[in-house]
């Protein structure tokens, strides 16, 4: 689906006015001398508005999940880049995304998940739209009992579509409609996980967190393994620091992997593996992040996707979805293992929440404005900052 209707409202000069030359220069230095984005990038509402307008709008990012709209007529309202969108599955089971506003007065069309929809009706004046976004009727539009019925009029004010593509379980959107093809954008990441047949995975559960921190702290923490020994005792026991390496960079993708001795330790013993894995792949965990907040971890027996939605400069919503292989996703005999995996991810992320909330508080201090980085561990978090800046040029 192609999108239309989005126009940038800002310029590079707006970005420079918040950052300043010194902060831009500090980001571009070699890592031993560099510092990350300054405090305003984590605390200033004006900066977050620029991120929406210049970063989110111009690239691909995840706005929804196919398991949330499994059947024709299902619809899910979401907030993405600070605006209301509607994700639905039409009568032909095609996934579509629209701006979730009526073309009459701008009322939000759908405010909660719906099923079995035949038509979309505005709650304000009952303008009705098909699931293809086309305008169908406008009651009393020409006066009392003078209804407007629209038939095959390409100029009728239908819902504004958003460019969208589905990759396995994840619905990616590009608001300005100008990004390269999604396959090209994902290719550096897919090279890291090409031995896993993701089509064999099925949704098994979701874990949610509301976190009083900026979305970038969640992503920086996700790709930075330096904190594991101090923050995650169970994870450190699973793979100690001596076996960990810093995250690597491939264009706009930051990625990592490790090899572990026990393929099922701590992750629900007895779960089926992806088909056709090599011996090495049955003992490997791989993960990556994209600059606009989405991450994916792939293990022999499950997948975890990591999705962060910015809400305010100091608040984000984190959603972790777990996918298991084949019948392990819903068969009763795998219920204990499913719960073990979900609890593991819930507990692991609880260990991070207080830490990344403390980073947000720290960014209100004039004693800190970007920090000093570890040349060994912090290349990927610094690259994320640079990619955010580059995406806003």
What are these regions (language model features)?
Residues 2-112, 162-165:
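N-terminal pre-ligand scaffold of iron-sulfur
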Residues 64-71, 151-155, 283-287, 321:
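Short linear motifs in intrinsically disordered
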Residues 16-45, 114-126, 155-166, 236-271:
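N-terminal short leaders/motifs
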Residues 33, 39, 43-44, 57-58, ...:
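Generic structural "secondary-structure junction" signal
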Residues 57-68, 143-148, 287-292:
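Short Pro/Gly-enriched beta-strand edge/turn motifs at strand-loop
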Residues 68-176, 183-184, 188:
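Rieske [2Fe-2S] iron-sulfur-binding domain
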Residues 3-5, 94, 100, 162-166, ...:
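C-terminal catalytic domain of Rieske-type non-heme iron oxygenases
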Residues 27, 33, 37, 131-134, ...:
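Glycine-rich, flexible loop/turn motifs
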